[in-house]
Amino acid sequence: MRARVCAIAYLLAAAAPAVRAADELPLAERLRQHPIVAHRGGYPYDDSNTLSRFEQARLVGAPVVEMDLRLSSDGVVFLFHDKSLQYATDCKGPFESLTAAQIERCKLNGLDHGPDRFERILQWSQGRVVLDAELKTASVVRPAIELVRRYGAYEWVYFQVRNGLALYREVRKYDARVALEAAPVGPHAKLYFDQLLALNDPKLLIMQMHAETLSAENLQRLHESGKLTSMDAWRVTPERTWSFWPFSRTASCLDVWRQGIDIAITNDPADCIDQHARLPQEAAR
């Protein structure tokens, strides 16, 4: 019953109209009021995790786009998910083994260009859209933070430090201010969850929830500490693209919010935005 009351209270709060322009809000409040993250800008598409897909997400109203960061051998930060180039491009070998110029000559599958530089995404956003950037390796930490500093992006960029504490510590050795999201998962998830929460880090804004840590007690602990929670919507119920009429896409964001989670990470930002607009009716049930 208590969990149900908390979930309804969240739905009502999330449905309340914003009183300030989104890009004027502190990052945590911006995420609280606009709790939708477009996974790779929308997925799966040939141009997922690229500027063109992010622009499509922005045009349908997505407040946050998610991406993956890796480093070239000469220190340039790019958007790319896999360790190897061979599955998503016409090149082969480890991503980190190539220079920026070589990477940019690799064609992404179905596209006429290679992976985008993170700096290009910062230039495109300029705070209009929040950037949720997953740090795929320790080597990309400092160059990525340097770009956040250069563009004054502390209130519209946050980094995912994944599972465990290694990447979290790598970030904090270099920068105490940048906002973070952690994602404890796997056999040691509960230990990592407790350790991260005990740090009392005000800039660890978000804890991504997985089956090992999702409970009413943990949600209460996080919210009492002022932290936000997030979840991959497609892990709750499938998000599909129907290949037959009416060719619709279906997000699972309502299923995330019904559990009292703050932020839904979705493959289908347009449908997720429509679901967010229906929250007042959902809360009134």
Features from the language model and the residues they span:
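Bacterial N-terminal signal peptides that target proteins for export
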Residues: 1-7
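Cleavable N-terminal signal peptides
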Residues: 8-9, 19
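N-terminal signal peptide c-region/cleavage motif recognized by signal peptidases
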Residues: 15-16
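Phosphate-group recognition and catalysis centered on beta-loop-alpha active-site segments
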Residues: 20-285
